[in-house]
Regions:
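Bacterial N-terminal signal peptides
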Residues: 9-19
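Bacterial N-terminal signal peptides that target proteins for export
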Residues: 1-11
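Sequence-structural signature of mature extracellular/luminal beta-sheet repeat domains
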Residues: 23-335
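Generic N-terminal leader/processing signal
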Residues: 2, 21-24
Length: 335
């Protein structure tokens, strides 16, 4: 599989645009005489969450002109890399909000770096679904694809310190694991209504898995061989919609519970950040809800980046935001 890199060391933060019921404020109507786009004011403000964010901090809109954003991770220089599935590229965003293309011809939703500094990405291009080493040039490698027993299509990934890759398969209701040697895969967790975002604790003893159609964020104990045990409810989501409607996935009446739970991130203190229905829900390492950062749109994924990893970037529904935090993202992993 070949990918075209057009910006060495860069990458864009891109989101797909979805239809919204009402026209965005300040956006000219279709067919207007002066179609120059004026970004809407979609900033929100944080509550005071001790140790996490000061009250009244702006959740600042960077852009709402993206196409399928997902999978943000921090690059070594502090800039942010994320996926733009609708545009089939990876995008980089610098500290000033400037976007640049990092890699083309890939429809990804999850990114990570292995201990060798290689970029791992899933690709959901029809007919090419798999998980690959995609960067640097010359190091490209297939880890799993549709010829691999047990693999169908992945949503999000996290790479452990040994180079193993955990990934969610929503349609198969399971979590897979690719060992550090990159040979094959195994299913390590099953019977999750709709697994979505995934991350690990700083010491990598706990695997966290979001269930976007369940009431609880799940936790598992990680074993030396990469398998997981002791499934448990880490916390009940701060907001759950109990409408029978299927929401944004599949036909109506498919699920009775919608948590909207999508991407996950952690900070250096072990707090867990969940992209939920009502914003970014922050939980203590023990699962206590500490507060929620409100957002103007539903967020799909998030990551800490910046020179000191104290900027929390949010992507989703065709837009990207950033918020300055009091805490630092976990420095030992890209996300």
């Amino acid at each position: 599989m070949r990918y075209k890199a057009t910006f060495v060391g860069g990458g864009l933060v891109l989101l797909w645009s979805v239809a919204i019921c009402a026209q965005a404020p300040n956006q000219p109507a279709q067919g207007a005489a002066n179609p120059a786009y004026v970004p809407p004011s979609w900033d929100t403000y944080t509550p005071n969450i001790p140790g996490v964010v000061a009250g009244g901090t702006t959740v600042e809109l960077i852009t709402d002109q993206l196409n399928g954003t997902e999978g943000p991770v921090a690059l070594p220089d502090g800039t942010l890399l994320f996926t733009q599935g609708g545009a089939r590229q990876l995008t980089r965003i610098d500290k000033n909000g400037k976007l640049s293309t990092f890699l083309e011809n890939i429809q990804s939703g999850g990114l990570g770096f292995d201990p060798k500094g290689r970029l791992i990405a899933n690709d959901n291009t029809p007919g090419k679904q798999g998980i690959y080493v995609v960067y640097p040039k010359g190091a490209e490698k297939t880890l799993v694809d549709q010829k691999t027993p047990g693999f169908m299509q992945s949503n999000d990934i996290v790479v452990d310190k040994r180079g193993g890759v955990y990934f969610t398969q929503p349609e198969q209701a399971n979590v897979g694991y690719i060992p550090p040697d990159g040979k094959g895969m195994k299913i390590v967790a099953e019977n999750i209504t709709r697994p979505n975002g995934i991350t690990m604790s700083a010491d990598e003893k706990i695997l966290y898995v979001n269930d976007s159609r369940g009431e609880y964020l799940l936790a598992y104990d990680v074993q030396p061989d990469g398998s997981v045990t002791n499934r448990r409810n880490f916390t009940k989501y701060d907001q759950i919609n109990t409408s029978a409607a299927g929401g944004d996935v599949g036909p109506g009446l498919r699920y009775k519970v919608t948590s909207c739970a999508d991407g996950l991130a952690i900070d250096k203190e072990g707090r867990v950040y969940n992209a939920g229905c009502n914003g970014i829900q922050v939980y203590s390492p023990q699962g206590k809800h500490l507060g929620t950062i409100p957002t103007a749109r539903q967020i799909q994924n998030l990551a800490f980046a910046g020179p000191d990893k104290k900027t929390l970037y949010l992507v989703g529904r065709g837009a990207a935001w950033k918020v300055e935090t009091l805490t630092q993202g976990y420095p030992g992993r890209a996300k």
